[in-house]
Amino acid sequence: MSWQAYVDDHLMCDIEGHEGHRLTAAAIVGHDGSVWAQSATFPQFKPEEMNGIMTDFNEPGHLAPTGLHLGETKYMVIQGEAGAVIRGKKGSGGITIKKTGQALVFGIYEEPVTPGQCNMVVERLGDYLLEQGL
């Protein structure tokens, strides 16, 4: 399966039991910042933004004072899982980032999708990739 198929079929799909509810944007990005696959709506990001995200995975709390920046959007960092998941909130939407051995799985959402639904979609794919050694 191509990386784009993972984004299209496992991240940008309808959320179980909620037809028509789906993430706003999603991507799989290598630890080096190279985009493996992304939805058409995923924001163009700066290398320093990806560096900040990777630093927060290695040093949890790094982004808390400044917020998580991705493209033109600033998210307030909320409780995640140290070294494994970063979660951010902005208004009625937010972001979940799951770290795997080689990649970061991004999901961005707006209402009516809930934070928990975004977490489920992103973390399920991230856990699968971890199980595959990726």
UniProtKB/Swiss-Prot annotation:
InterPro entries: PFN, PFN_euk, PFN_sf, Profilin_CS. Phosphorylated by MAP kinases. Disulfide bonds join C13-C118. CDD domains: PROF. GO terms for molecular function: actin monomer binding. It is found in: Cytoplasm, Cytoskeleton. The variability of the residues taking part of IgE-binding epitopes might be responsible of the difference in cross-reactivity among olive pollen cultivars, and between distantly related pollen species, leading to a variable range of allergy reactions among atopic patients. This is Profilin-3.
